[in-house]
């Protein structure tokens, strides 16, 4: 997946570690991950639990 910003990473993408990944739905996030931000019907922002 493509790196994305999780809520726990901080307010801005720049200067922060991007610990999330963009994941295509509707298959859901990988095991051990959860959708931390809604990003349309076909893409989820998945972050580690």
UniProtKB/Swiss-Prot annotation:
The record marks 10, 15 as: Important for affinity to sodium channel, probably due to the flexibility this residue gives to the Arg-14 loop. The record marks 18 as: Important for high affinity to sodium channel. Changing residue 39 to A: Small decrease in affinity for cardiac (Nav1.5) channels (1.1-fold) (with increase in both K(on) and K(off)). The record marks 37 as: Important for channel affinity (interacts with rat Nav1.5 channel residue Asp-1612). Changing residue 18 to V: Decrease in affinity for both cardiac (Nav1.5) and neuronal channels. Signal peptide: none annotated. The record marks 9 as: Important for sodium channel affinity and for toxin structure. Changing residue 48 to R: Minor effect on toxicity. GO terms for biological process: regulation of signal transduction. Changing residue 39 to A: No change in activity. The record marks 33 as: Important for channel affinity. The record marks 13 as: Important for sodium channel affinity. Changing residue 33 to S: No mutant obtained. It comes from the Eukaryota. Changing residue 17 to A/D: No change in activity. Disulfide bonds join 4-46, 6-36, 29-47. Changing residue 43 to L/V: Small decrease in apparent binding affinity for both neuronal and cardiac (Nav1.5) channels (tested by ion flux studies). Changing residue 49 to Q: Minor effect on toxicity. Decrease in affinity for both cardiac (Nav1.5) (5-fold) and neuronal (37-fold) channels. Loss of discrimination between cardiac and neuronal channels. It is found in: Secreted; Nematocyst. Pfam families: Toxin_4 (PF00706). Its main location: secreted. Changing residue 16 to A: Decrease in affinity for cardiac (Nav1.5) (8-fold) channels. Binds specifically to voltage-gated sodium channels (Nav) (site 3), thereby delaying their inactivation. This toxin has the highest affinity of all anemone toxins for the mammalian sodium channel, whereas its paralog Anthopleurin-A retains the greatest capacity to discriminate between cardiac (Nav1.5/SCN5A) and neuronal sodium channels. When tested electrophysiologically, this toxin exhibits a high affinity for multiple sodium channels with a 50-fold preference for rat cardiac (Nav1.5/SCN5A) over neuronal channels (0.1 nM versus 5 nM). This is Delta-actitoxin-Axm1b. It comes from Anthopleura xanthogrammica (Giant green sea anemone).
């Amino acid at each position: 997946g493509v790196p994305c910003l999780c809520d726990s990473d901080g307010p801005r993408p720049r200067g922060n570690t991007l610990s999330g990944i963009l994941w295509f739905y509707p298959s859901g996030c990988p095991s051990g991950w959860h959708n931390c931000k809604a990003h349309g019907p076909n893409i989820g922002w998945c972050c580690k639990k």
